Amino acid sequence: MMAQRVGSKRMKKAPTKKDKVGLREVAAAANVSVATASRVLSGNTRVDRDIQKIVLEQAKKLGIDPAQRNKTKTLAFVLSNRAMLHAFHSRILSGAEAHCTANGWDMVFLSFNYSPHVPSTELHLPRVLQRHDVIRAVILAGTNSENLIKLLDHKGIAFVVLGNNVVGDQQDLKNNDVVFADDIQGGKDATRYLISLGHRHIWFVGNTRLPWFARCFEGYRRAMEEHGLVARQSNTDSEDETEIGYLGTKSLLARDEPVTAILAGNDPTAHGVYKALRDRNLKIPDDISVIGCDDTVGTWLSPALSTTREFPEQLGKQLVELVLKRIARPDQDPQCVMIPTEFIKRDSCGPPRASRTKTAGETLQRATIK
């Protein structure tokens, strides 16, 4: 079944007495938090037995049947703070939807933009996410922050999160179900490959304020330090990934420092790197080698881009797998799944020539004279 998009327009009906009775009313009647009431009604046995009894009694008095409440088989795929047509997240959605269908579940799709700076107590969830009779659990993709995660926890909404794109301290995820692509290892593998070719003047181009760039940079940094090399980066404060690559490379070349290879934080950034190098008449890989990360557009570029492949469809499958396990066993310990990356060797890398260990300005001058 195709994922359905939930838009802002919805038909309204006149509220009835039954409509007005929900989780908040049960929590108030039982004198517990909304999160506790949600956990009890979802079957979480870790809640104190006396509290469970009180919540279930109050739910019964209010006409709420937990068994009926838990019959819905619909998940919400929430794409936060990212473009709806983003290639990588579209493939995650595709993998998630396929696994839902294979397991007899439906999925709705929501685009949700929010500020990471708004306190969780002031953040307003889409109403459909708070309808436990409509949505059983949530898959968080896109770019997410601690405030939304805290809010879902507080409301007792079951969810799983794509960890790579969580802004802030990812230690905060230890109490939640989370799936990662191992892009730290991917950054490390890409850097090690460049080092194996003889490169020593390797720069990272990205925006480490964004978590997926920060994780790739961390792998790069570790590999450089393993070999006694200095990790250096050209950062651009933008969310346009191609622009990050273009402006970051222009800035790097203007510094007039030695550079023989560039690790771009992802493939769209590598596309921007290509454009900046060609504007300066620098050839890839003859003058400067380039590697990307994620394998989204690498085969479209010329020369074909060496990169670290992530597996977005597999990420989507694992996100669904974890959240279905959470639904089946609400009291299980938080789970973390790490999906390995794979280095893909193509045509954008080669060994450095002796002349390429000179400064970027000297390399540019040589390229211009040709």
What feature does the model see in each segment?
Residues 33, 65, 135-136, 199-202, ...:
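Short acidic/polar active-site loop segments enriched in Thr and Asp
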Residues 1-71, 365-370:
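N-terminal helix-turn-helix DNA-binding module of bacterial transcription factors
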Residues 80-91, 109-121, 178-189, 204-250, ...:
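Hinge/beta->alpha junction and helix N-cap segments in small-molecule ligand-binding domains
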Residues 58, 95-99, 151, 215-227, ...:
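Alpha-helical structural signal in soluble globular domains
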Residues 6, 232, 248-370:
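Flexible loop/turn connectors
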Residues 33, 65, 101-106, 158, ...:
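Residue-level detector of anion-binding/catalytic polar loops
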Residues 1-18, 74-192, 252-254, 258:
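Alpha-helical recognition/docking segments in bacterial nutrient-uptake
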